[in-house]
Curated annotation (Swiss-Prot):
Binding site for substrate: L134, V135, S136, G137, G138, D167, G180, N272
GO CC term, one of those recorded: cytoplasm
PROSITE patterns: GLYCOPROTEASE
InterPro entries (alphabetical): ATPase_NBD, Gcp-like_dom, KAE1/TsaD, Peptidase_M22_CS, TsaD
Domain of life (superkingdom): Bacteria
Entries under NCBIfam families matching the protein: gcp_kae1, T6A_TsaD_YgjD
Gene Ontology biological process terms in this record: tRNA threonylcarbamoyladenosine modification
SUPFAM superfamilies: Actin-like ATPase domain (SSF53067)
GO molecular function: iron ion binding; N(6)-L-threonylcarbamoyladenine synthase activity
Localization, UniProt: Cytoplasm
Name of the protein described by the UniProt record: tRNA N6-adenosine threonylcarbamoyltransferase
Length: 337
C-alpha cells in the first residue's frame, strides 16, 4: 500500500510517498525561508501563493523519484490543520482533487500527529506508551500517548511556544530569520554561567510552560550589557540553557506522573543538539529511552504526513468530496485508531 503525503501548513512544501512494506520511497521538500527572510517572519499570503507554484511540480518530482505513476498510489494524505488557513487550503485542494481524479481515498492528517509519529520512520521506532514532547515554533506540549489517537494533554505553553521564543530572541540578538538554529550555533560559542536566565514555571507544580518572559529577560540583558560578539554568544548560551532546562524539568515531571519509561520528542526544536543531549542524559539516569526523528524529519515535511496518513487510512479514516481545513485543531480531538 502506497500513500502520497502533502504538507503545506506553513512555509515548507513537502511531498512524500510511503509504502507500508518498503518504507519511504520519495521525499521532496521546498523551503520558503528565503522568500520570508526580508520580512522577519512568515507572510501568509506569500506562503499560500508559493505553495500554489510548488506543490504540483514537487508531486511530479516525487513520482519520478519513486519510479511510480498515479496508478500506483493507493491514497492521498494531506495536512488539514492546524496551520495557516490559506496554506492549508492549497494542500487540501490539491490532495482532494488528486484523490478524486485518481479514484483513491483522501485522508486529512493532523499536522502535530504527523510530527508525533515522525520518529516511527526511524529504524528503532518507539513502542506505546510514551510521553511526547511536541516542541516547535507554534506548539510546546506534553502528551501522554498510549496508542494512535489516544492522546492526553498533560501540559502546554500558556503564551509563546519554545520555537517562537527562540526566533524572537534571535531577532533581538540581530540574527536573521529563522533565528532559532542560528541562536543555537551562536550559543555553542558562549560561556556558560556568565548570565543566568530564569527557568519559567519550574518553581510550582504542574506541566504547563511559559516562554514569553525569557524574551523580555533577554532584551533587558542585551540592553544592560552591550552587543559585542562574545556578550551576544553568552546571552544566547544562557537563553538556550534556560529553555532546555525548563523542557527537561517538565519532561521529568511528566514521566514521573505517568510512570512511562519512554520519551518521544518531535517538532522543529527537537533537532536542537543541546536538548537532545540533555534529554538523553536524563533518560539514561532514569533507565529509560528517548526517541526522536532525524533532523530533516523534525521540521515540516511530507514524509511524516504520508506515514500518518498510512496509519489513519488503515484505521478507516477518509474524507468526503468537500475541502475543509482546521487552522486550530486540538490534538486530543482525534479519534483513536
Amino acid at each position: 500500500m502506497r500513500v502520497l503525503g502533502i504538507e503545506t501548513s506553513c512555509d515548507e512544501t513537502g511531498i512524500a510517498i510511503y509504502d507500508d512494506e518498503k518504507g519511504l520511497l520519495a521525499n521532496q521538500l521546498y523551503s520558503q525561508v528565503k522568500l520570508h527572510a526580508d520580512y522577519g517572519g512568515v507572510v501568509p499570503e506569500l506562503a499560500s501563493r508559493d505553495h500554489v507554484r510548488k506543490t504540483v511540480p514537487l508531486i511530479q518530482a516525487a513520482l519520478k523519484e519513486s519510479g511510480l505513476t498515479a496508478k500506483d498510489i493507493d491514497a492521498v494524505a494531506y495536512t488539514a490543520g492546524p496551520g495557516l488557513v490559506g496554506a492549508l487550503l492549497v494542500g487540501a485542494t490539491v490532495g482532494r482533487s488528486l484523490a478524486f481524479a485518481w479514484d483513491v481515498p483522501a485522508i486529512p492528517v493532523h499536522h502535530m500527529e504527523g510530527h508525533l509519529l515522525a520518529p516511527m520512520l526511524e529504524d528503532n521506532p518507539p513502542e506505546f506508551p510514551f510521553v511526547a514532547l511536541l516542541v516547535s515554533g507554534g506548539h510546546t506540549q506534553l502528551i501522554s500517548v498510549t496508542g494512535i489517537g489516544q492522546y492526553e494533554l498533560l501540559g502546554e505553553s500558556i503564551d509563546d511556544a519554545a520555537g517562537e521564543a527562540f526566533d524572537k530572541t534571535a531577532k533581538l540578538l540581530g540574527l536573521d530569520y529563522p533565528g532559532g538554529p542560528l541562536l543555537s550555533k551562536m550559543a555553542a560559542q558562549g560561556t556558560a554561567g556568565r548570565f543566568v536566565f530564569p527557568r519559567p514555571m519550574t518553581d510550582r507544580p504542574g506541566l504547563d510552560f511559559s516562554f514569553s518572559g525569557l524574551k523580555t529577560f533577554a532584551a533587558n540583558t542585551i540592553r544592560d550589557n552591550g552587543t559585542d560578539d562574545q556578550t551576544r554568544a553568552d546571552i544566547a548560551r544562557a537563553f538556550e540553557d534556560a529553555v532546555v532546562d525548563t523542557l527537561m524539568i517538565k519532561c521529568k515531571r511528566a514521566l514521573e506522573q505517568t510512570g512511562f519509561k519512554r520519551l518521544v520528542m518531535a517538532g522543529g526544536v527537537s533537532a536542537n543538539r543541546t536538548l537532545r543531549a540533555k534529554l538523553a542524559e536524563m533518560m539514561k539516569k532514569r533507565r529509560g529511552e528517548v526517541f526522536y526523528a532525524r533532523p530533516e524529519f523534525c521540521t515540516d515535511n511530507g514524509a511524516m504526513i504520508a506515514y500518518a496518513g498510512m496509519v489513519r487510512f488503515k484505521a478507516g479514516a477518509t474524507a468526503d468530496l468537500g475541502v475543509s481545513v482546521r487552522p486550530r485543531w486540538p490534538l486530543a480531538e482525534l479519534p483513536a485508531a
